[in-house]
Regions:
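Cytosolic catalytic domains that perform sulfur/thiol-centered chemistry
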Residues: 1-195
Length: 195
């Protein structure tokens, strides 16, 4: 994972609520054994509709997905997070996330930013009016700023998850940051346990 303090980008308005992981990436994509190539499966069913927002050329360079409430509900699948990231998104802003999806996001370096619905609606309106609207997510201050509409909103994040983003650590990285303590502990183990 890379260290993230500030995310600056443009957004894409996904005006849908209760988006489940099967809608994010259909189950037939889960048969793959490698961890790459999932971007083509992102919202695959919806992308058949030429009016679907991901097909709108105005948002081709968006790096922040702005969705409705209850994003990522349904079964746990890291593939959903991988598809979102591999498509080019660095963060998802929504009023709420399923717990499992939020945890999968933080473990894989995709920022899950929970804002109040009224703030999300203001961001939707801004990016629909101007696709170049800049969104700044500050992972240190835990704020989202959209200067063009004078919006600054704070979002919650558990301290250990904020620590992951600020320091670029996944589960293995966190474990390795304690390697001296682990080695010290292991050196005190009876030898019959190590043979």
């Amino acid at each position: 994972m890379k260290s993230v303090r500030i995310l600056t980008g443009t957004g894409i308005p996904l005006r849908r609520s209760d988006v489940d992981t099967d809608q994010i990436i259909p189950a037939d994509w889960l048969k793959r054994v490698e961890r790459t190539g999932f971007e083509a499966g992102l919202f695959a069913t919806w992308r058949d509709d030429r009016n679907f927002v991901l097909n709108d050329e105005r948002y081709v360079s968006a790096t922040i997905l702005v969705a409705g409430p209850s994003f990522g509900v349904g079964s746990s699948r890291e593939h959903a997070v991988w598809a979102i990231q591999q498509y080019g998104f660095e963060a998802v802003i929504a009023p709420s996330f399923s717990d499992i999806f939020r945890n999968n996001c933080t473990k894989n370096g995709l920022a899950p930013v929970a804002l109040a619905l009224d703030a999300v609606e203001k961001i939707w309106a801004a990016i629909e009016a101007d696709a170049a609207t800049e969104i700044v997510i500050d992972m240190e201050r835990l704020t989202v700023e959209v200067a063009s509409i004078s919006l600054t909103a704070s979002f919650p994040m558990e301290p250990q998850n904020q620590y992951r983003f600020l320091n670029g650590l996944d589960d293995i990285g966190i474990t390795m940051s304690h390697s001296e303590e682990i080695a010290s502990f292991e050196s005190t183990r009876p030898t019959w346990l190590t043979n």
